[in-house]
Amino acid sequence: MSPKITVEKLNLWYGDFQALLDVNLEIREKAITALIGSSGCGKSTLLRCLDRMNDRIEDVRIEGSVRIDGEDIYRMKKADLPRLRKKVGMVFQRPNPFPLSVYKNVAFGPKVHHMAGGAEIDEIVERSLRAVHLWDELKDRLNESALGLSLEQKQRLCIARLVAVKSEVLLMDEPCSALDPVATLRIEELMRRLKSDFTIVIVTHNMQQAARVSEETGFMLLGELLEFGRTTDIFTAPRDKRTEDYITGRFG
């Protein structure tokens, strides 16, 4: 089976500073891939390359290719970026619901993309909230502001927004770092359920989390993807001593 995402010879500079060095990576479809490494290693920069969010940063230069379903996203015209961002959704470290009602948060994307109207929107909202296990909690609060939800509920709502527009890839940048341990485990369980329909890439400082939820893991160091493989292999039999040193806490 062809990979969902293929990264080849990817290099990125912030001004004169090179943040990514010749990254090559294949990400499987409908699986969870984790990127680990110490702060500043380039893992979040790499994640943001997968939906061209780094384009928004001044003085960024990128070389190489990122192909999703065979299409090189760095050859896309700017007019095609909304299509890319619909297909590839981002879940941030801090949940960022719109200052709107719960209902309008989920309905916003389908309306903007002209996916549905009227009663169909109602169905999309319910289906999306059910997918993230929020419907039973919020079905009587749909008209309340999303800003009044708990942190965990806000994060689930942000994921529901991506479900609503039928994103195919979910990029998660430290999605549990603001949550308590119980909420973290619930988000991890949600990720496991969602992977049957989505390709998920998660950046995390939490190595236990990477070991729990992912099938494949990449270890990054100083802008290089130093090692990539099955998560069980990375954590039990790493090929590179620097990977072993990081996982065992000798540095990081």
Q: Where in this protein do the model-derived segments appear?
A:
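Conserved ABC ATPase signature
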Residues: 143-149, 153
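ABC ATPase "signature
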Residues: 228-229
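ABC ATPase NBD coupling module
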Residues: 61-62, 72-89, 112, 234-238
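Conserved ABC ATPase "signature" region
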Residues: 65-72, 119-140
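Catalytic Walker B motif of ABC-type/P-loop ATPase nucleotide-binding domains
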Residues: 170-173
